[in-house]
From Swiss-Prot:
Assembly and binders: Part of the 50S ribosomal subunit.
A single MF term (Gene Ontology): rRNA binding
GO biological process, one term: translation
Pfam families: Ribosomal_L4
PANTHER family found in the cross-reference section: 60S RIBOSOMAL PROTEIN L4
Alphabetized UniProt keyword annotations: Ribonucleoprotein, Ribosomal protein, RNA-binding, rRNA-binding
Species name: Pyrobaculum aerophilum (strain ATCC 51768 / DSM 7523 / JCM 9630 / CIP 104966 / NBRC 100827 / IM2)
Lineage of producing organism: Archaea, Thermoproteota, Thermoprotei, Thermoproteales, Thermoproteaceae
Chain's role: One of the primary rRNA binding proteins, this protein initially binds near the 5'-end of the 23S rRNA. It is important during the early stages of 50S assembly. It makes multiple contacts with different domains of the 23S rRNA in the assembled 50S subunit and ribosome.
SUPFAM superfamilies found in the cross-reference section: Ribosomal protein L4
Protein name per the record: Large ribosomal subunit protein uL4
Database matches in InterPro entries: Ribosomal_uL4 (IPR002136), Ribosomal_uL4_dom_sf (IPR023574), Ribosomal_uL4_euk/arc_CS (IPR013000), Ribosomal_uL4_euk/arch (IPR045240), Ribosomall_uL4-arc (IPR019970)
Protein family: Belongs to the universal ribosomal protein uL4 family.
A GO term from the CC aspect: cytosolic large ribosomal subunit
Length: 283
């Protein structure tokens, strides 16, 4: 039986799920200085040569998103803490349980009564997390990393890339020492990333619904993802308040920041030390 299953699996045609690469992947990555000038070439990690799998990226995103869901339940005695009983049959009234009292007390306990129990309350044991295999998860992350290197995928996601010299955008390690927002803005302008930050700033809108009262007043589009080599890099404090910008250490890369909404192709700024660290990760 197992051999038949394996045989059928090997005969599966995965071509509909593997997107053809829109252009030839670059084997060398261009490194730019803080002033935006070309500095050198470095060998591209294998992650950037991975086939792009939107189906796996979407699946990994839903798995990571559902892992945040909080189990919900209700108090077992909710709606049942009343002294009530049914009057029985033969009185020309519904057999619904009623409060004890004079005349015809109102109904209680039943789901269709005021203050009664819920018919189908949320269960704590309900499975909320969509599981994913470890190898699938790593493959999805590598595929999402590869999508950041293609201008067509990044532009299709809505990012402004007209002034970006090349993708992926890699900057020298000295950029991680920047600790002022003014200097970080100059870096973004030199690399052609600032127009995308302005796009995110213009897209900030007030949320519809009750979320406004619950600490989620504004909806903000995603713009540039900055990947650094270390969480202690001063650059993190310099750029974290830019509209739509996320900063993450390379060893903490995840599908939620690489493909927000499950859509690959986020505009990403890599530092050269982060690219070197990436070579041994998610393989």
């Amino acid at each position: 039986m197992m051999n038949e299953v394996l045989l059928k699996f090997k005969q599966l045609d995965l071509s509909p799920y593997i997107q053809p690469l829109p252009e030839k992947p670059a084997e060398k990555l261009k490194v730019y200085g803080i002033d935006g000038a070309y500095v050198a070439d470095i060998e591209a990690p294998l992650h950037f040569l991975e086939p792009i799998r939107p189906d796996l990226i979407r699946r990994a995103y839903l798995s990571a998103l559902s892992a945040r869901f909080q189990p919900k339940g209700v108090y077992e005695g909710a709606g049942k803490e009343h002294s009530c009983e049914s009057f029985g049959v033969g009185l020309g009234i519904a057999r619904i349980p009623r409060y004890k009292g004079s005349l015809w007390p109102r109904g209680c306990f039943a789901p269709n009564t005021r203050g009664g129990r819920r018919a189908h309350p949320p269960k704590v044991e309900k499975k909320l997390h969509e599981e994913i295999n470890k190898k699938e998860k790593k493959l999805a992350i590598r595929s999402a990393i590869a999508a950041t290197a293609y201008r067509s995928w990044v532009a299709a996601r809505g990012h402004v890339v007209e002034k970006v010299p090349s993708l992926p955008v890699v900057v020298v390690g000295d950029a991680e020492k920047i600790n002022r927002a003014k200097e970080a803005k100059k870096l973004f302008e030199a690399l052609g990333l600032w127009p995308d930050v302005e796009r995110a700033a213009e897209g900030v809108k007030i949320r519809a619904g009750k979320g406004k009262m619950r600490g989620r007043r504004y909806k903000e589009p995603k713009s540039v993802l900055v990947v650094v080599s270390d969480l202690n890099a001063p650059l993190i404090a310099a750029v974290r308040n830019f509209p739509g910008v996320d900063v993450v250490a390379v060893n903490n890369l995840n599908i939620l920041v690489l493909a927000p909404g499950g859509v690959p192709g986020r505009l990403t700024l890599w530092t050269a030390p982060a690219v070197e660290k990436l070579r041994g990760l998610f393989l």
